Amino acid sequence: MVALRFFFFSSLLILLILSQALIMSVGSASQIRLSSTFSIQEATIEDIRVAFNEKRLTSKQLVELYLEAISKLNPILHAVIETNPDALIQAEIADRERDLKNTTKLPILHGVPVLLKDSISTKDKLNTTAGSFALLGSVVARDAGVVKRLRESGAVILGKASLSEWAHFRSFSIPDGWSARGLQGKNPYVLSANPSGSSSGSAISVTANLVAVSLGTETDGSILSPASQNSVVGIKPSVGLTSRAGVVPISLRQDSIGPICRTVSDAVHLLDAIVGYDPLDEATKTASEFIPEGGYKQFLTTSGLKGKRLGIVMKHSSLLDHHIKTLRREGAIVINNLTIPNIEVIVGGTDSGEEIALLAEFKMSLNAYLKELVKSPVRSLADVIAYNEEFAEQEKVKEWGQEVFLTAEATSGMGEKEKTALQKMKELSRNGIEKLIEENKLDAIVTLGSDLSSVLAIGGYPGINVPAGYDSGGVPYGISFGGLRFSEPKLIEIAFAFEQATLIRKPPKFIA
């Protein structure tokens, strides 16, 4: 008990010192700066690009600034599992390319650092472990599809972000943001608050200005929820719009890779870089046909709410009332008190069939992923379970268990029970959100936080979260806009217009 008290008060003192230092840095000339004209605090992709072009900043210097910020704050936040040993080399290459080429013709992400959730594979010196020691030292065959596109855009891979271990699919008892490798991620606004997950580190890193932009993954809520809890923008694309090849999977039917950034425009620029056909992910073939010519940045318009029909579909708190007024003021037609049939069944997860299907899909998908690894200490879900039992203390099995793993391992493929579950989800989607949107001619549905993530998840629908405020204790919350498959253009218009009309986001203060 004495040791615990000493640790607690020592940690608190460190937090207070770091917090005060960061607050002072944000509000004064003592900010972390390269020069008197550039700061990484809240810097957007456009800010960085302009600084590059004006010779006020190099990519190498930018990477150094982010690495410095990580070294100072990551011992408290546990947002980054590891940084890339080659990040500075990549940045130097980008700087040389910028000197040799017409900068106006370089991709907008050229030389910009990106952090990846630790379930997204990279064929380099970085590990890809889903936060588990079971995969430490494994070697992937190739970059994930989205990473390949990032490299082609000239982005610098800064490192791997922490996450809820195995994307929160080892045990539902594991706290959001915890993994054996990454430890417990902290919410930068209120350190004792839930950072959410499973893309916790991606959201924490971005909101704490440890990186410019990041990528997360979502099966059900894992982008939208941490984005909401950490006052950042998260885009969960329609399933298939971004490749899942090379990503530690849960369900190819529901998994989606998307941006987590501080602004809608940054998220859209990152989305533009990662969408497209990948022969290693069959779902991208059909989805790529819906990518608009010229990309998604053309939908970044401040008039994006004008004439949009938006539906409020769940009982909402007074926190949303103010924003409903804003939406209407900006020209949207807001229809209140709408109902999605069987919403309680969908949100519940078990009765909808989602959990039944995910368990079987996870075992099949993970086994396939592990077998494709060039080198790995584990080759199947059964191997991972055995590893956790052997190294139970390291993986905190006694504390958190692995009941989801065990239940998934007991499945035997897509049997009648699983097929019935899949059919039920299709019917719930068809008779639920699809019918609601079509009958009311809606452009999007609206909710606080990620309350409708399961509605979007089971149908492969897209969603965007935008910062919407802070509660009385300083904990952030967001507003989410969801729509039918491939309705990203409308959702981006709505989200960007809302963001620009409110400009609610503010940097964290690290309240202990």
Swiss-Prot record:
Keywords: Hydrolase. It holds the Pfam family Amidase. It catalyses: a monocarboxylic acid amide + H2O = a monocarboxylate + NH4(+). Coiled coil: none annotated. The active site is at residues 117, 198, 222. Its EC number is 3.5.1.4. It comes from the Eukaryota. GO terms for molecular function: amidase activity. PANTHER family: AMIDASE (PTHR42678), OS04G0183300 PROTEIN (PTHR42678:SF34). Belongs to the amidase family. This is Probable amidase At4g34880. It comes from Arabidopsis thaliana (Mouse-ear cress).
